[in-house]
Amino acid sequence: MVYICIDTGSHAKGYAVESSDTDYHIYTKCDRETFEKFIDNKELLKNRHAKDESGNDVKYVDLYTGLIGILTGKSPELSMFSKREDFKDKYGIENLQLYEFVTKLMTVSMVKIIYTLMRYKILNNAKGLLQLMFNYVYVEYYLDYKRAPKSTKILNMLFNVGDEIKITMDKNNQLVVNDLNVLDLNKNNGGYKIDETLTLFVKNVKLLKLYVKLMQRGEYQQEWTEYFQQWKQQLQDRLHHVPEPPERTDIRHNIVMYALNERGPVMPEDENKIVYQIYPSVSHLDQGKKGTLADKEIIVQEKLDGCNFRIICNQNKITYGSRNTYRPDGNFMNYYRIRKDLETCMRSLQARFNDGFIVYGELMGWKDDAKTTPINVINYVDQKESLKYYAYEIQLYGGEFVPFVEAQELLTNVGFNTIPCHKYLYNDFVERLNFKSLMFPQSPLEGFIIRCGNLIYKLKSDYKDLNKLKIEKGPFEWLTCDYIKSNCDAIDKSDMMKILIFCYNMCKVKNYNEKLLFNKVFNLFRQQFNLNHNDYKNLYKQYVNMCKCTEYK
């Protein structure tokens, strides 16, 4: 989860007065399911306006909307007013990868952003002109230096300094630097020596004087509008020489993939780096998906309520990352407590894969050795260790995963803790579903992870209608692999027609359920005999001909 709170109002822009409130934008990231629904219902991620307890204006924005706003230049506040320390995850830990992505995204979109800043009308009041002054100063800064300013405050931009230099206007309507030095605006050369280490320069003293006048919020003067009209024309003339940037559909694609939790926030030029590979988002099992699992063997693991954590081996270096964020330097959840053991296991795996692979797993336990603050909602009182890592997948450079069963064996052999796996027929699993943990009997069970071939789903304990996941029993429900093999000599896929003939005769099939029987038998032996789509087509063709032949009726 992402939580970013930034000030986008007069305080951030440097023209606030004592009575000014604060204008906040709060960005959060919706879950995958909400974003999927947003594709058909744009109202789901619509901005929401409110007031906080202090009466400040608050706009709630989904992160996807904020990122697209930067890309298009139409609502770039997230990139313009945020600082590195503003980017946090739900644990309050710095999200450096997202900050770097937003910074790069802003660089790509700067021309579109400054065109947006130029579109506002010239208003006939001091406050409106100060708002416009911010826009024009920002645009002029970019045209002069070809980069974003170090600060978003008007005076700091004019003097080309960052927020470490404090420039304010006192009660006597004088500009003061660092609360000590008063600037003499009648000194027209634009240079102001503050001390032996700091001299400030400004190219337009007249603009400084206009700022002071506007900050007094006095009676409107026509000459102000005339100044802004002339200034606007000068900027537009300069912008005529700045070409429109090309559309970046590749970046838009990556933003969408990030919203779907299929990728972290990464620019296209970086997406093939192994440190930015993340574990694919897992969909919820629901009624609409049960048909793909009916009559098939599934592998089930308990879903642990920890923190998704990846260990990356790349160029003989081991680094770490959370769900969507690469964390080469951050001490996520104080994982240093088990870091030595993790790296020992990774080095053992490196002997098998050489270099360029990722181990995905779950950090479980507490943020501290005293066990005072659980990592997540569920408190696993059965766990003796203050922090433990359960590994569950291995991904190679390029995105390919090691087959799941093979990966479990490899992870266990090198010393990783793994989550026990159990095999069931899907129909039996949902019929006897029980949300009780075998790993942690004294703690609630968050749910299950269910795998079938390349399919993977999660089933949480709060699923509303479990009965809808069950498979209605058909006329051939009693057929099992064990029954067939004990009554029919079957060794491999070459015996499939023999099996089909046996089942056809045993079940006394009618015309309307011939295909139902075929699908039932095919799925029973699909994994065991390694049957594929071509096998299905060839066998079904023979089966249809067999059904037409009276000698089998």
From Swiss-Prot:
May participate in the recruitment of G-actin to the host nucleus. It holds the Pfam family RNA_ligase. Its main location: host cell. It comes from Autographa californica nuclear polyhedrosis virus (AcMNPV). InterPro entries: RNA_ligase_dom_REL/Rnl2. This is Protein Early 65 kDa. One of its GO terms (cellular component) is host cell cytoplasm. Keywords: Early protein, Host cytoplasm. The keyword Glycosyltransferase does not apply. It is found in: Host cytoplasm.
